[in-house]
């Protein structure tokens, strides 16, 4: 009986710890996305914009490993699909930056914020 109880307690704490680590990892990725989105919009030169976009892409790519719970009954894209869309928009903005079109890239970057807002609307975080 003691072994069963001990095993149950250990399993519970392992599950709780893994959930906490996952939430912290996702939270860190979301903070990195937000911080670098702001840096991208404030960038005065292509190098700063490219660095911010690269950091955003890394955070979005890393975030794909987390499967988020939908908080609506509406049919919505998976969290992985939303992160894929964000990555596509980041790549489009990066192409514009590399072509010397920083202002146009910032306009393109607004779609990233729209996707972020959509994700926050549909997913628990």
Describe every region a protein language model picked out:
Residues 8-11, 21:
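Cleavable N-terminal signal peptides
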Residues 32-62:
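N-terminal targeting signals for Sec/Tat export/insertion, comprising classic cleavable signal peptides
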Residues 50-56, 76-84, 105-113:
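Short, charged, amphipathic alpha-helical segments
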Residues 1-9:
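Bacterial N-terminal signal peptides that target proteins for export
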Residues 30, 53, 60, 83, ...:
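Generic L/I/V-rich hydrophobic alpha-helical segments across diverse proteins
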Residues 17-23:
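Sec/Tat signal peptide C-region and signal peptidase I cleavage site
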Residues 87-125:
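Surface-exposed, polar helix/loop patches in the mature regions of secreted/periplasmic/lumenal proteins
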Residues 60-80:
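Short, solvent-exposed, charged loop/turn and helix-capping segments
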């Amino acid at each position: 009986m003691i072994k069963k109880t001990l095993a149950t307690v250990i399993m519970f704490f392992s599950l709780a710890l893994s959930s906490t680590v996952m939430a912290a990892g996702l939270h860190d990725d979301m903070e990195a996305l937000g911080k670098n989105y702001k840096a991208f919009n404030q960038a005065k030169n292509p190098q700063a914009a490219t660095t911010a976009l690269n950091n955003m892409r890394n955070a979005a790519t890393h975030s794909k490993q987390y499967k988020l719970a939908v908080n609506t009954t509406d049919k919505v894209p998976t969290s992985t699909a939303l992160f894929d869309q964000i990555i596509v928009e980041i790549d489009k903005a990066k192409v514009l930056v590399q072509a010397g079109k920083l202002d146009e890239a910032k306009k393109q970057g607004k779609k990233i914020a729209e996707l972020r807002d959509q994700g926050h609307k549909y997913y628990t975080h």
